[in-house]
Each structure stands twice: as C-alpha cells, then as structure tokens.
Design a protein with these regions (language model features):
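Conserved G/P- and acidic residue-centered "switch" motifs that form tight phosphate/ATP-binding loops
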Residues: 111, 219, 263
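C-terminal-of-GTPase-core extension/linker across diverse P-loop GTPases
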Residues: 1-2, 6, 130-253, 270-272, ...
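Generic enzyme active-site microenvironment
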Residues: 261, 295, 321
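A glycine-rich (often HGG/GG-containing) alpha/beta subdomain
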Residues: 1-134, 138, 142
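Short glycine-/polar-rich loops that comprise or flank the Walker A/P-loop
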Residues: 9-11, 38-40, 288-292, 315-318, ...
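Short glycine-/small-residue-rich Rossmann-like dinucleotide-binding loops
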Residues: 230, 265-266, 290, 297, ...
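Inter-motif core of Ras-like GTPase G domains
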Residues: 275-299
C-alpha cells in the first residue's frame, strides 16, 4: 500500500509486509537486499528491461518490526503517476492491496501492540491539538498498557489467594482466608480504578474539543460574540431580533483548547413557527453542552427571559457574559464584561484557557484512559469489584465471591484487546488509512 499521501511530493513510500516480501521485491530491484535488518539499499525498480524509478529500499527482518513480520518500504519519487506505476508493478508481480489499517492490525494480531496502543495510533493520526497528540503518543508508548497490567496483577493476586484456599483446603501451611482479610487489598484496588476513571472523565474534551453553546435572548450579541471568537463573519449580525433562526457552528483554537462553537437562536416566546423550532433546538443543546456561554445585554435592564435563562442554566458549566460594555452597564448581575462588537473578549478567552487547562495531565505520567470504550470497561471492572467487596463486607464465603472478581478481570483484559471480538477490530482498523 502507499503509506504517504497521494499528492505530488519529494518522496512516496510504498509499504509491503509478509513472509518472503524481501525476496519478492528483490525480483524487480537492481540493488542488493541481502543485508541485515534496518538497512537501506539504492537501485532501480525494473519491469523487465525497463527502469521504472530510481529508489531507496528499507528492509526489516524478523519479528521485531512494526507488523511483527518481514517488511519492505520502497522510497520512490513522489509524483502521483510514478508512485502508482511502482504500486501497479508490485500488484502485477503478485502482491495484493492492503486493507484499511491492515499493517496495524497485523501488528496487533502478532502481539507487537495491544488494542489500547492501536487506538492510540489512530488518535495520534487524527489529533488536532498538542495535548491530544501528547496523550496519544503516551498511549503508543504503553502508558495505558502498563497501568492496566498493574491493575490486572493486583486483581489476580486476590483471585489466586481465594483459588488456593478453595482447591487445597487440606494444606496446613496455607492460612485460612476470610473475607475480612481480602477487604484491604480489594478496597485499595477499587480506589485505584476509581481514581483513573475520575482523571479520565475529561479526555473527550482534549480529543474532540469542548462543545460550547452560546445562548441568550434575541439581539443580545450572540452572533457578534461568535464572529469575534471565530474572527470571521460566520453569523449574520443585524439589529433585527430573531435573525438567527437555527444553529450556526464553527471551531476555534485557544492554545491547545479546541472550542466547537454553536450559536443558537435567540430564546424568547414567538409565534413564528420556524423561529420557534430554533428556540426549541437551542434549549435542547444547553443540556448537551460541555460549556454554556450565557449572553446578557448589559445596556438594558434584566428581563424575565434573562432570568429564566439564568435559572435554566444554573448548575451547568456556564459563563455569564455581560455584553455591550462599550455602551455602559445598567445591570448588577455577576459575570464577565465584554464588548463582542468591539472584540473586547480577552478576559473571556483567558477564563476559558484557565478553566480547561489539562497540561497537568498531558505533561505528566498521569494514568488516564483514552476513549469511551476503555472508560466503560474500567467502569464495569470497578462495578464487579465493588459487588465482590460488598459481599466480603456481608460475610459471604470467599468461594462465592470469586465469580465477580473474575468478571472484573475479564473487563480489564478487554481494555487491552486480550479477548477482542472480530467486529470490534473491524470497526477500529477501518478508520485507518490503507497504508497504516
């Protein structure tokens, strides 16, 4: 497969993997590939007597390659035509096109990476900010692998203690095990799991961005705020109330924070059916948002619609903005004073940067999970362990507790893909490009 972009460039890389692939490429390469692993050879790709391209070829032998099998990478000139010509020759000689993510899938199946590392590769490719890239790289390096293995080891020690007592009760040198003796280690392990879950709850904000909804009654400056944040005229700005009848979206980057902005229709009572639908949609988006920006017009007294909106968003993660500060302020509601029309929003931007600063996690060896699949499995592991702990506290015999402990252990194994289902692998690797 072509592992680089199919665009004109200095170099294109064609990747081949599988037993015998080095000898296969040697059959139409003029250079010498009879060298040790991780070496580069110069020569020409030839089709019979015709020279097709001048290339450098990297070879990787043995099981210590990315895929866990022999690999070849042909570095040819980066023209689209010449790259396709070399690829076509490889196919004519007997190779087949790789499927999406097949190289990474082979790496997983051959034990070179586990499922969490495969997911991290996908995350690094799609990362849209530095913090997401750092987290993904840690995943590739085995950060998740290591702490999940530690949890598994702690859990299997507890299970082993129980199994030994069940299978060999007649041995006098084996101390009789009671639920009371199992409790301290089990409770400590549950705390480790719950701490990881607590640290992982905001990972989707780093990877996917912060869903940010701008709400307020009509003509308070919501669209002006969106345009000021986006630094472009994305929303229509007029003095006519109800101009924005549906949602308007855009994304902005504040350092390493990505805000997925949604400007909603002004919230008010209206007879206009189309505007009413927009208002209804605005209200539904409030509950789904990670951050709600409530915009008030500071140049006019607070009205019933403002109060209703403040009550509606109380308890949510919100920032109250007093807009039109350039016209003077006649309300005493607590909030950040801005002038969206004049682009005076620096205090708001700094507030968001401070609130969503994840550097303590991304710049450390903090134990965090990368996605919802992993979080759900660790939640299940913690829940099963908690059932076992409750049984211990109730004095239930240890041989009846071990089933829940095994359930917890199986969920930990699934995080690393040790018993991954085929459809899960298909779903993951089809997200990869063909050459990865």
């Amino acid at each position: 497969a072509i592992a680089t972009s199919r665009l004109e460039a200095a170099i294109s890389i064609i990747r081949i993997s599988g037993k015998g692939c080095i000898d296969f490429v040697q059959s139409f390469f003029t250079g010498n590939l009879n060298k040790k692993s991780q070496t580069i050879s110069y020569g020409y790709i030839v089709d019979g007597e015709e020279k097709v391209d001048e290339v450098l070829i990297s070879i990787y032998r043995g099981k210590h390659t990315f895929t866990g099998e022999e690999m070849v990478e042909i570095n040819c000139h980066g023209g689209v035509f010449i790259t396709n010509k070399v690829l076509s020759l490889c196919l004519k000689k007997g190779a087949r096109m790789a499927e999406h993510g097949e190289f990474s899938r082979r790496a997983f199946l051959n034990g070179r990476i586990d499922l969490s590392q495969a997911e991290a590769i996908s995350d690094l490719i799609t990362a849209n900010n530095d913090q997401a890239a750092k987290l993904a790289l840690k995943g590739i390096q085995g950060n998740i692998t290591n702490f999940i293995k530690d949890l598994k080891e702690d859990l299997i020690k507890i299970i082993t203690q129980i199994e030994v007592n069940i299978d060999y009760p007649e041995y006098e040198d084996i101390e009789e095990l009671t639920a009371e003796k199992l409790l301290p280690g089990s409770v400590s392990l549950r705390k480790k799991m719950d701490d990881i879950l607590d640290r992982s709850k905001n990972m989707h904000l780093i990877k996917d961005g912060i869903s940010t909804v701008i709400v307020g009654k009509p003509n308070v400056g919501k669209s002006s705020l969106l345009n000021a944040l986006l630094e472009e005229d994305k929303a229509i700005v007029t003095d006519i109330a109800g101009t924005t009848r549906d949602v308007v979206e855009g994304s902005i980057r504040l350092n390493d924070i990505v805000l997925n902005m949604i400007d909603t229709a002004g919230i008010r009572e209206t007879e206009d059916k189309i505007e009413h639908m927009g208002v209804k949609k605005s209200l539904s988006l409030i509950d789904q948002a990670d951050l709600v920006l409530v915009v008030l017009d500071g140049s006019r007294p607070i009205e019933a619609e403002d109060k209703e909106l403040l009550e509606r968003t109380e308890g949510l993660n919100r920032i109250v903005l007093i807009n039109k500060s350039d016209k003077g302020c006649v309300i005493d509601t607590e909030g950040i004073h801005i002038s969206a029309k004049e682009n005076h929003i620096d205090e708001l931007i700094q507030h968001i940067k401070d609130e969503f600063d994840f550097s303590a996690i991304t710049n450390s060896q903090a134990q965090v999970l990368a996605n919802q699949r992993q979080v759900q499995l660790l939640e299940k592991a913690s829940q099963s362990l908690n059932v076992a702990i409750q049984a211990m506290e109730d004095g239930i015999p240890t041989d009846l507790i071990v089933t829940d402990l095994y359930d917890s252990w199986e969920n930990l194994k699934e995080i690393l893909g040790e018993q991954a289902k085929e459809d899960l692998l298909d779903e993951l690797f089809k997200r990869f490009c063909i050459g990865k």
